[in-house]
Amino acid sequence: MTPEQSPLGKPSAYTEQYDASLLFPIARKNAREAIGIGAQLPFFGTDIWNAYELSWLNARGKPQIAVATFFVPADSPNIVESKSFKLYLGSFAQTAFESMETVRDTIKRDVSASCGATVSVHLTAPYEFGKLQMEEFEGLSLDRLDLDTDVYHPDASLLTAALDEAPVEETLVSNLLKSNCPVTGQPDWGSVQIHYVGPQIDHAGLLRYIISYRNHTGFHEQCVEKIFLDVLKACKPVKLAVYARYTRRGGLDINPFRTNYNLPMPDNMRLARQ
């Protein structure tokens, strides 16, 4: 299925009775082929989704709530289109379930089937909400740089590195990532953390490159994979990890992580803008 066939950007009838058919899968393949990624992926990782508007009824009709977190493996053949995900989660609102575990297992089954891979699901109950603390990305802020730029479409030629010098290890951070939904044109605001080992990347060029996504249209996952691939090709790091966290829309935030070396999956930290 293509994004144009999805419910995104179209009037939708909201249902409050559970309906797994609302989930709309989109194949990762086409977007990856467009940037030169074939069947052999140059990375592994996960997409972390957080859903803040999940509610259902218990067996006695009393509303229940939870914050849901989903871990979608980067090698899954599909992603779930975000509006369909919102509609699907909304369909739980007037449906009775025996327990929170039943809700979790139902969501895990449905979303895994839609993505074509096993998706991990965690539900945070209200008594645990106090543990959901805000954090910020660790690393050197690129946003401190005072620079000029007029490039607002992705341009990998902005990326340079000291290829003839000794390798370094750095973690660089920017809150200036912005792209746009390819279906609705709505802005997607994000923060990005880039950790690498290799030739030192020119900081000003990297910041200009991140800013160059400002008028780009692409889903969150696609943007992060393009950033990963462009940095890998232009700057030739031995190790590279890219983690972006986007602000929520429709009660959902999406946070893709890609790496080419063994790392634990990143913390599902909530940034201030999320």
UniProtKB/Swiss-Prot annotation:
Give the annotated active site: 181 (thioimide intermediate), 188 (proton donor)
Q: What is its EC number?
A: 1.7.1.13
Q: Name one GO cellular component term.
A: cytoplasm
Top-level taxon: Bacteria
What's the catalysed reaction?
A: 7-aminomethyl-7-carbaguanine + 2 NADP(+) = 7-cyano-7-deazaguanine + 2 NADPH + 3 H(+)
- Report if keyword Cytoplasm is assigned: yes
Query: Which key words tag this protein in UniProt?
Result: Cytoplasm, NADP, Oxidoreductase, Queuosine biosynthesis
Biological pathway: tRNA modification; tRNA-queuosine biosynthesis
Assembly and oligomerization: Homodimer.
The family classification in the record reads:
Belongs to the GTP cyclohydrolase I family. QueF type 2 subfamily.
* Listed name of the protein: NADPH-dependent 7-cyano-7-deazaguanine reductase
Q: What is the lineage of its organism?
A: Bacteria, Pseudomonadati, Pseudomonadota, Betaproteobacteria, Burkholderiales
Q: Gene of origin?
A: queF
